[in-house]
Amino acid sequence: MRKIIFIAFWAMLMIMPAVGQVTFGVRAGGAYSSLVQKVEGTYNAGARFGFSLAGLADIHLYKGLSLRPELAFVNQGGSFYSNPQVEGAKNSFNKCSYYSIQVPVNLAYTFIINDVQLGVYAGPALDFSLFGKMKTENQNVDIHFGHTKEADLKTFDLGVNVGLRVDYSRYFFSVSALCGTLDRRAIEREGESSLYQNNVTLSLGYMFR
């Protein structure tokens, strides 16, 4: 996992000199984080509040078009049921909080309105989970990512990220939604539903222009 993060970071650095103007920045914000599953035909989202800290770059491509990669440290998680659709099995309600490295690579377009810049962006996001805790059956246990035990989650996720950003001078406000596309369960029994991580993040940031 560390090798993958290292390769992704150096790939970002190699792209930057090959293009035009590059501006760096930082952001910090709160996240409404949820784990989504389908229970008895309806989608349930067990949510919690987390945070997101990131370094980012704005790589100008053409006119209002730019590439915006990020390297973020994220606290996320949520709650979900084990065995909700397995006949004769005991249902377990699980709450988890864990930390991840996320690497969104967004394509953005910016509209200039007087002194304000309004931008929209979208792109894929890689998620590498590091460590965390899960409360299940009145016990707090460590999450061992990549293991195949009942209380564990998968290490890797691939998400789709969309967002809106407003810049004024060197400061900006952004709201983004990230939807995971891969099942996070380490073990999925017959009849169990898939489990997906979703986040909505509100951030304040600063660009070093």
List each model region and its residues:
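Hydrophobic, lipid-facing positions within transmembrane beta-strands of outer-membrane proteins
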Residues: F51-G55, I101-V105, L118, L158-L164, ...
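Short glycine/proline- and aromatic-enriched beta-strand/turn motifs that initiate or cap beta-hairpins
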Residues: G20-A54, M207-R209
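A hydrophobic membrane-anchoring alpha-helix module
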Residues: D167, F172-L182, I187
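Extracellular/periplasm-exposed beta-strand and loop segments of Gram-negative cell-envelope proteins
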Residues: S34-A47, Q76-S100, D127-N161, T181-N199
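Short, electropositive, low-hydrophobicity segments enriched in small/polar residues
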Residues: G29, S33, A54, D127, ...
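Short glycine/proline-enriched coil/turn segments at helix->beta-strand junctions
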Residues: Q21-T23, G64, V166-F172
